[in-house]
């Protein structure tokens, strides 16, 4: 970090998993500037502080979209070594590892495992290519081999290079970038994710009869790639984001450089997704599928590095002090919401700067209402699910998280007030079944009007259950009050007749 003249700070390097930065400024003229906010802040926080929970969260949602049997899931999780076609056994792995160790000891960027330091060196090439996207045949026409070797030696030395000095041509830089990716120990998308990418390419739409069509399901493919990219190592994910953005911007200039997204995919698929140990015969079966997959990544690169909304919401609840955050089985029940709905709190905070304390109370009420609505919708969804093993599992987990929550309201002994346990499921049940529980609560509470035998108590009887104990007590009191009223009226008539007879006698 280097200090600037106005007291601010700028980041000269490439930050890993760009975290949210907050700048405090007292200059009133700058307060109108937009505030930079990272919507995936809590997602990255969860990844770094609780990686086991993060991995389980992402994998559980990824398996909703693609079918990964036990062995393939274990490969994705890194529990077993990936078994790919054309694998030559332990001997080849040993020699590859030995070569990687030798390269690592020399501190070489090319051919070494991917690190943030290596990305910082390669970023000089990416930044230069962003300024020369109009070069015709970029990434297709090879450059000068001598200039490329000189540039490669400079990068391996760890020095800052003035690529724009005019000594190098854009084709030299583009070819060297492909060379760097090709010499990585494994593809940029890793061997562990190879099977998952093949499964994502097979996600197709279904017709009205439920039959699988040949039309790709783009929405599910984007969601699956978003989740899969979250599982990449941080250096791989950072470089992949830089690379796909460069290729996306290059494809936008295809009218000048003659390089479409498909042409770029043909150039880069061997370096970012093809397994290193595959032969031509092994690859022939999936060649078109892999190339089309890279084309899809380039076209939709601006969406692939954002966490799905339900992942953001889970991470936010995890760090917001929620007593019982949503479990992995509940995530598929959460509806997909727009980012504006999930970040209304940010805009509310921004609007209440300098406001009165009452606005703070209003903000808390809005936050509480937002959470309650989400929980209410979640419980309703579970309640309306057809009877199945999954529903029973969700209900068991739901009750396990809140063991003290009563399933139904029980009778309360006279003279003792029932203390309701304020638990997660209890709050949801009270919100979803609010009207029914409110009516039962009224039936169990004897109001002053009912104690006096008023008409109000009589009207309330039709709103409560016949079997409710409150009905019995209320009717008993009403009967007693009616008897007292009859006795009072009889006594009053007796007094009036006695008084009248006394007057007649006196006359």
Curated annotation (Swiss-Prot):
> Polar residues: which segments have biased composition?
400-413
The record's keywords, sorted A to Z, are: GTPase activation
The coiled-coil regions, if any, are none
Q: InterPro entries under this entry?
A: ARHGAP19_RhoGAP, Rho_GTPase_activation_prot, RhoGAP_dom
Report the GO terms under cellular component.
cytoplasm
PROSITE patterns documented for this protein: RHOGAP (PS50238)
Q: Does the keyword Glycoprotein apply?
A: no
PANTHER family in UniProt:
RHO GTPASE ACTIVATING PROTEIN 18,19-RELATED (PTHR14963), RHO GTPASE-ACTIVATING PROTEIN 19 (PTHR14963:SF7)
Which protein, by its recorded name, is this?
Answer: Rho GTPase-activating protein 19
Native organism is Xenopus laevis
């Amino acid at each position: 970090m280097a200090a600037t003249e106005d007291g601010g700070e700028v980041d000269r390097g490439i930050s890993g998993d760009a975290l949210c930065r907050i700048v405090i400024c007292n200059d009133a003229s700058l307060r109108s500037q937009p505030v930079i906010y990272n919507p995936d802040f809590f997602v990255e926080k969860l990844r770094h502080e609780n990686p086991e929970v993060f991995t389980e969260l992402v994998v559980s949602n990824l398996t909703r979209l693609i079918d990964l049997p036990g062995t393939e899931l274990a490969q994705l999780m890194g529990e077993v070594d990936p078994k790919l076609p054309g694998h030559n056994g332990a001997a080849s792995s040993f020699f590859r590892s030995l070569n990687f160790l030798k390269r690592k000891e020399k501190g070489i960027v090319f051919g070494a495992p991917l690190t943030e330091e290596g990305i910082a060196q390669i970023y000089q090439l990416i930044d230069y290519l962003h300024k020369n996207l109009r070069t015709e045949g970029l990434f297709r026409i090879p450059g000068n081999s001598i200039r490329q070797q000189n540039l490669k030696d400079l990068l391996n030395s760890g020095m800052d290079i003035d690529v724009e000095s005019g000594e190098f041509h854009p084709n030299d830089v583009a070819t060297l970038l492909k060379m760097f990716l090709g010499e990585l120990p494994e593809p940029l998308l890793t061997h562990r994710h190879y099977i998952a990418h093949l499964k994502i390419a097979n996600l197709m739409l279904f017709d009205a009869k439920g039959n699988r069509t040949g039309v790709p399901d783009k929405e599910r493919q984007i969601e699956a790639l978003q989740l899969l990219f979250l599982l990449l190592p941080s250096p791989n994910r950072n470089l992949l984001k830089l690379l796909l953005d460069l290729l996306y911007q290059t494809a936008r200039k295809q009218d000048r450089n003659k390089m479409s997204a498909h042409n770029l995919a043909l150039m880069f698929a061997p370096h970012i997704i093809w397994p290193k140990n595959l032969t031509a015969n092994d690859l022939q079966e999936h060649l078109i599928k892999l190339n089309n997959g890279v084309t899809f990544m380039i076209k939709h690169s601006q969406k692939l590095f954002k966490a799905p909304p339900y992942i953001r919401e889970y991470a936010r609840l995890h760090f917001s002090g929620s007593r019982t955050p949503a479990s992995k089985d509940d995530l598929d029940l959460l509806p997909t919401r727009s980012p504006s709905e999930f970040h209304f709190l940010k805009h509310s905070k921004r609007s209440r700067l300098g406001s009165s304390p009452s606005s703070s109370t209003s903000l808390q009420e809005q936050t509480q209402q937002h959470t309650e609505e989400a929980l209410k919708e979640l419980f309703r969804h579970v309640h309306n699910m057809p009877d199945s093993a999954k529903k029973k599992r969700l209900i068991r987990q739901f009750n396990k998280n809140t063991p003290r929550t009563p399933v139904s309201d029980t009778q309360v002994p006279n003279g003792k007030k029932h203390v309701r346990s304020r638990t997660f499921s209890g709050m949801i049940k009270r919100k979803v079944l609010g009207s029914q529980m409110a009516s039962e609560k009224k039936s169990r509470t004897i109001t002053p009007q009912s104690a006096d035998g008023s008409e109000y108590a009589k009207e309330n009887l039709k709103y409560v259950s016949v079997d409710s104990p409150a009905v019995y007590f209320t009717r008993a009191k009403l009967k007693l009050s009616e008897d007292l009223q009859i006795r009072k009226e009889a006594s009053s008539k007796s007094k009036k007749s006695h008084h009248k007879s006394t007057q007649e006698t006196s006359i």
